[in-house]
Structure formats: C-alpha cells, structure tokens
C-alpha cells in the first residue's frame, strides 16, 4: 500500500485506539477500586498498567509516529504537532522509545506475578511494601537502556538526513521534512569504493533493543508455560476451583496471544527486515497500527475474563437498557392516556 494510504490507516487507528484505551482503562480502574478487593497486590499492578496505557496513548497521539523500512534502514518518524528544535525532537523520539520498551517490561512483570501466585506463593511477598518499590527500579534499567541507545547510538548524519528526506518525498508527500523528527536505524553503509559494510554502532543498538524485547518475551513465555502446567495439575479440585482455573487459563492464553500478535511479532519484523535488506517501505506502518490498538485490548481481556468485572459491566448496561425500556413504556402509556381523555 502507498504511504498516504498508510497515513490514513494509522491516523484512524490512533483515534480508535486512543478512544478505546481511555474508555476501557477508566472502566478497569473503576472496577479495580470497587470490585478488586480479592485481587490483593495484583490490583495495584493492574492499576499501574492502566494508568501507563492511558499515558502511552497520549504520547502516541502527540508524537504521531510512522515507521518505514527501506535500503537496510528502519526509520521511526514522529510528526510534530508543535514547532520545536531538532534536539528536543530527538529527545521526544527517545522518550517514545522508552514508553514502547516499558510496555514490554510491564507485560513481563504481569506474568511473573501470575507465576508467583500459581507456583511460588511464598514469593508474592516481593510484591508487598517495601519490596514493591524495587520493581519499578528494576524495570527502569532495561527501559533506560532502550531509550539511551535510541538517543546516543543513532545520531543524525548527512546520510540519514538525505535518506529521510528521500523517504518523505517519495512516499509521504503531505509531510514536510521540517515538520518531523526521526531516529534512523542504519544497518549497513557504503565506503568510498561502494563496498557495503556493517554499521557496528547502530547494529549494537539494535542488539540491545532485541535483547530487551527477547528477554521479556522469554520471561513471559516461561512464566506462562509454568503457570499453565501448574493449573493442569489441579484437575481433581472442586467444581468451583476448576471454574476459576478455567477463567485464569483463558486469561493466560489471551494475555499471551495479544502481546505476541500486537507487540512482539511486529517489533521482531521491525528489527529483522532491515538486516536482510527486506524493503517493507510504508508497509512497516502495520507496526504502528498494532501499537495504537494494543493498550486498549489487554485491559479489555481482563474485564471480559474476570467474572466480577464482567458481571458488573453487563449489569450496568442491562440496567441502563431496562431503565430506558421502562421510561419508554411510561412515556407511551402517558401519551395513550392523554389521547384517551381527549
């Protein structure tokens, strides 16, 4: 598809994703406050993820990122809503990368908690105060690694300036160079003889990114598998326990699939395609498309799977529907009475 068509799709996903993320996470925060008493410390982790998801959606809507892969180079381009300096634009792009990395890391922490709760309950004390404060500190390390690499190892050069200008002029005619900031992941360059060589500085940064992403995925997969394995061992439990285990299993499967489909797989393509000189061009924007939708999907799964949350939401809408029907019937009866008196 053309770059202009992808811009339309990405901007639509931005509106839909932001609206869904804001509404679903506000509902989840309300449910956590009023129906989350039995979740223990996990509700604080869920609340943090909900607040972060809303914040992340706001950052995405402000920076309006697009992605492009061409000539063994991956471009992360942010469309400016305001006029600011090139350096501030670079900082903003690195900050977006930090938020992007945080979504990976926090998802991994979710699975660690679920693993502790199912397999190592004695370790759950690590999610209580004061140990709870160590988790944000630990999570900040890979996040800062990702952001620092994005800022320091991918400088703007004459080559990247010419390359991003060519990309905009060729694929995104409605975007002017002065209205964007960018980070260019250059995998290969050419010497004065036209011989291609690996650009080690940028490749090192890509390795750091890929390591952080792979580490969180491995944690998520191992914790998910061990949790699933533990659940299967409790088949002889009571009907009520089996029902609860079934709910948790569904949540576990969906919470594994959603990040894999909307985060890990697209980001894996983002790093691998340039290495093999696969020119996705504007089609790389499917990564942005997925990232806009993900923050609203994960909490929606929790609302639909956790019975107390689901029943509360359904009762709310059913009650509103019932009240609407009753009001309509009352209005109809009143009108009929007026007609009868005349």
From Swiss-Prot:
This is Serpentine receptor class r-10. The lineage of its organism: Eukaryota, Metazoa, Ecdysozoa, Nematoda, Chromadorea. Belongs to the nematode receptor-like protein str family. Keywords: Cell membrane, Cell projection, Chemotaxis, Cilium, Glycoprotein, Membrane, Olfaction, Receptor, Sensory transduction, Transmembrane, Transmembrane helix. It is found in: Cell projection, Cilium membrane. It holds the Pfam family 7TM_GPCR_Str. An odorant receptor which affects chemotaxis to the volatile odorant diacetyl. Specifies AWA neuronal cell fate via the odr-7 pathway. Interacts with odr-4. One of its GO terms (cellular component) is ciliary membrane. Residues 1-11, 60-92, 153-202, 279-285 are extracellular. The chain crosses the membrane at residues 12-32, 39-59, 93-113, 132-152, 203-223, 258-278, 286-306. Residues 33-38, 114-131, 224-257, 307-342 are cytoplasmic. It comes from the Eukaryota. Disulfide bonds: none annotated. GO terms for molecular function: G protein-coupled olfactory receptor activity; G-protein alpha-subunit binding. PANTHER family: 7-TRANSMEMBRANE DOMAIN RECEPTOR C.ELEGANS, SERPENTINE RECEPTOR CLASS R-10. It is a multi-pass membrane protein. Glycans are attached at residues 71, 83, 179.
């Amino acid at each position: 598809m053309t770059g202009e068509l992808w811009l339309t799709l990405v901007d639509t996903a931005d509106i839909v994703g932001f609206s869904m993320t804001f509404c679903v996470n506000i509902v989840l925060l309300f449910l956590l406050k009023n129906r989350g008493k039995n979740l223990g410390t996990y509700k604080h982790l869920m609340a943090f993820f909900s607040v972060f998801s809303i914040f992340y959606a706001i950052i995405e809507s402000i920076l309006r990122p697009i992605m492009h892969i061409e000539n063994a180079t991956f471009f992360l381009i942010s469309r400016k809503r305001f006029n600011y300096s090139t350096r501030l634009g670079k900082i903003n792009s690195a900050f977006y990368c930090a938020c992007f990395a945080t979504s990976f890391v926090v998802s991994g922490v979710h699975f660690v908690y679920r693993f502790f709760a199912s397999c190592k309950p004695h370790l759950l004390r690590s999610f209580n105060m004061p140990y709870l404060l160590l988790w944000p500190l630990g999570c900040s390390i890979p996040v800062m690694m990702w952001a620092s690499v994005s800022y320091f190892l991918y400088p703007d050069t004459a080559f990247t300036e010419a390359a991003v200008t060519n990309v905009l002029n060729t694929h995104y005619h409605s975007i002017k160079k002065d209205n964007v900031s960018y980070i260019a992941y250059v995998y290969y360059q050419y010497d004065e003889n036209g011989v291609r060589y690996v650009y080690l500085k940028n490749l090192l940064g890509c390795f750091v990114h890929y390591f952080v992403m792979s580490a969180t995925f491995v944690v998520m997969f191992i914790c998910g598998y061990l949790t699933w394995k533990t659940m299967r061992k409790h088949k002889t439990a009571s009907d009520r326990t089996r029902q609860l285990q079934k709910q948790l299993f569904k949540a576990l499967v969906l919470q594994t699939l959603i990040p894999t489909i909307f985060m890990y797989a697209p980001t894996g393509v983002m790093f691998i395609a340039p290495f093999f000189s696969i020119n996705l061009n504007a089609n790389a924007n499917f990564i942005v498309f997925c990232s806009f939708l993900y923050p609203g999907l994960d909490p929606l799964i929790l609302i639909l799977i956790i019975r107390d949350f689901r029943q509360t939401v359904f009762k709310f809408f059913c009650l509103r529907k019932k009240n609407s029907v009753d009001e309509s019937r009352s209005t109809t009866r009143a009108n009929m009475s007026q007609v009868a008196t005349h």
